[in-house]
Amino acid sequence: MEIINGPVLPRYAAPATGALTSDAKISGQLLRRVHLRRRACGLQGDHYRAARRFFGFPSERHARSGWVWPVCCSYGSSSDGDGAAAADYDASGEEFVNSSVMEAVELRSVSDGFVIKMRDGKNLRCVQNNPRVLRLRDSAPHHAIVLKMEDGSDLLLPIIVMETPSIMLLAALRNIRIPRPTIYNVVKEMTERMGYAVRLVRITEMVHDAYYSRLYLAKIGNEEETISLDLKPSDAINIAFRCKVPIQVNRRIAYNNGLKVVQPTPSESYVSSDQFQCTRLDRPDDQPCFEAQEFDLVRNMLVAAVEERYKDAAQYRDQLFMFRAKKKNMI
């Protein structure tokens, strides 16, 4: 693996001064026309304020409750917003590495690193690949989507997400049939009906502890005509997995924020005479198995959420919280 030293330096696309001047002139002309028409028709001030929010300058359009556009789109072959050509999205492919999705459930911080809990109940102990980067100051578990780098480094990139995208991705990984279509299935079908196909998803940069990703679409029959969308990584990864397209990660992000899996400590494992690595085995006894009870609650909650039985899922969630609190008090 080629190691890139130094901090992550995200690139920002500085808008041209001429574009800002042109935008200001157009906004001012539209605003003056609306103002004159308001006076001629006798409209009230609320209509004028609404027009200012729509046709005014960016500071006026987005001043209300910090509202911003949820999706940014670049069309054509000029630029995708970060300096790379939108149509030729493989031009800077050397900056990215392919990755695969792991069946991870949650991520939590411990004293000596991190622990990734997998769907099958296994825990992966990890340490930061770059010790200078500090993340996850609290020890509470977080829902996470984990990407594994496919360049031979085996680095893991955890992305903290909300509960619903994590459950939807696990359902897709396990081929669990959901009775009603999800938003990701709707986006996939809508894209195909518009004559486009999803080609690629990239995790491009990290700004203020938030990952940025882009979804690349290409016109079917004309690969030169592309659309680049700015999406949340959780949504972009869900769409990419369902469309079976590559998921790429910026190499600097993988190096600076990736985790390395460490071997279990000697107290947790031993090597038998036949040289097989054996871990501690669960042995039946007369005591209740808390791990099995916790696993049953988690499984029932996930199944209920996937089947859209949200009331049952909420009940299982409350039972799980009470069970974990009781277990913590017993320790």
Curated annotation (Swiss-Prot):
Key words, A-Z? Hydrolase, Nuclease, Nucleus
Q: Where in or outside the cell is it found?
A: Nucleus
Per its record, what are the GO molecular function terms? nuclease activity
Any Pfam family from its record, for instance, is BFN_dom
Q: Which InterPro entries match?
A: BFN_sf, Bi_nuclease_dom
Ranges of residues in domain BFN: 126-261
GO process annotations (BP) = protein ubiquitination
Q: Coiled coil: which residue ranges? A: none
Domain of life the protein comes from: Eukaryota
Top-level EC class, please? hydrolase
Q: What is its EC number?
A: 3.1.-.-
Gene Ontology, cellular component aspect: nucleus; VCB complex
Q: What is its main location?
A: nucleus
What are the residue boundaries of the UVR domain, all occurrences included? Answer: 291-326
What the record says about family reads: Belongs to the bifunctional nuclease family.
Give a short account of what the protein does: Bifunctional nuclease with both RNase and DNase activities. Involved in basal defense response. Participates in abscisic acid-derived callose deposition following infection by a necrotrophic pathogen.
Protein name as annotated: Bifunctional nuclease 1
